[in-house]
């Protein structure tokens, strides 16, 4: 067994002694290692592809421009705009990749007020929402009309008495920012995004509701996978690499929380970021 063939399994003896148990445990370890290496390999391949795309656009446009005999001023301006857009895309992608690899090194000892955090996200994204023609709102009411099942909060158990959570303010800000930005990007024209902060059974819930086209059931878990995009052409047009929600998922898990799609239909979707609440 070598690094290249970790999928190889040892034959488990037909017995119930320690050797059989040890062999079975060893095979399970190999399977986990093989899965981890495969995931890392796929992630690296996807990252390389995403990095290559803006570089290819830059190279192609520069080569075309180089062949022009006497470029006009408007052509220079178009070239500069393209370079600015593609370098910004590269910078954002590299920054997100670094964030995902450095999560464990960020201290998580801040006492974070979620209402204040959401307010800061709104201030920063207000120009983005205005440019997109999307209205953003904070809903501080104490009741919501949620369907009730094993994954969905019961309105009767919700309240607004959110205290604080302990974690990294920087990372939690990034998680909420990504959720709200995503809801703005993939919304309908003149749509809206509503954010509310609730508490249920010691869990703080940041609910982000949009008026987009919804997310199909088969994609509701996949959207949190790295590099996954429901509509690849639309995501590329908006500069997305499919890492925003994956980073949210990583940050949530790093704070002993979860993120998932609570409900989705043709009228829009609601995503919930759930985090443990502190009592101090």
Please provide the spans of the model-predicted regions.
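Membrane-proximal HAMP signal-relay module
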Residues: 1-47, 51, 56-74, 81, ...
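Short beta-strand/loop element within the Bergerat-fold HATPase_c
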Residues: 190-202
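Short helix-loop "hinge" at the ATP-lid/N-box region of the Bergerat-fold HATPase_c
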Residues: 183-184
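Acidic ATP/Mg2+-coordinating residue in the GHKL
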Residues: 210
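Short conserved segment of the HATPase_c
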Residues: 215-229
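Glycine-rich GHKL/ HATPase_c ATP-binding element in histidine kinases
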Residues: 267-269
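A conserved beta-strand-to-alpha-helix junction within the catalytic ATP-binding
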Residues: 16, 110-126, 132-145
């Amino acid at each position: 067994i070598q690094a290249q063939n970790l999928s190889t399994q040892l034959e488990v003896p037909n017995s119930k002694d320690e050797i059989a148990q040890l062999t079975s445990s060893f095979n399970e370890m190999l399977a986990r290692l093989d899965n981890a290496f495969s995931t890392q390999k796929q992630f690296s391949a996807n990252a390389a592809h995403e990095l290559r795309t803006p570089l290819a656009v830059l190279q192609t446009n520069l080569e075309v421009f180089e062949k022009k005999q006497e470029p006009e001023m408007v052509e220079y301006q178009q070239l500069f705009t393209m370079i600015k857009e593609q370098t910004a895309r590269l910078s954002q992608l590299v920054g997100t990749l670094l964030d995902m690899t450095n999560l464990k090194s960020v201290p998580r000892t801040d006492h974070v007020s979620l209402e204040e955090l959401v307010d800061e996200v709104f201030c920063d994204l207000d120009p983005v929402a205005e440019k997109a023609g999307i209205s953003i709102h904070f809903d501080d009411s104490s009741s919501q009309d949620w369907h009730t099942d094993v994954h969905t909060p019961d309105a009767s158990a919700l309240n607004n008495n959110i205290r604080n959570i302990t974690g990294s303010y920087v990372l939690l800000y990034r998680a909420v920012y990504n959720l709200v930005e995503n809801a703005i990007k993939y919304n309908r024209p003149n749509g809206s995004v509503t954010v509310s902060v609730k508490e249920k059974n010691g869990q703080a819930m940041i609910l982000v509701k949009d008026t987009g086209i919804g997310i199909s059931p088969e994609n509701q878990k996949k959207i949190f996978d790295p590099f996954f995009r429901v509509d690849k052409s639309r995501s590329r047009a908006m500069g997305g690499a499919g890492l925003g929600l994956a980073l949210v998922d990583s940050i949530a898990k790093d704070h002993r929380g979860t993120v998932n799609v609570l409900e989705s239909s043709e009228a829009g979707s609601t995503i919930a970021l759930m985090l443990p609440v502190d009592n101090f």
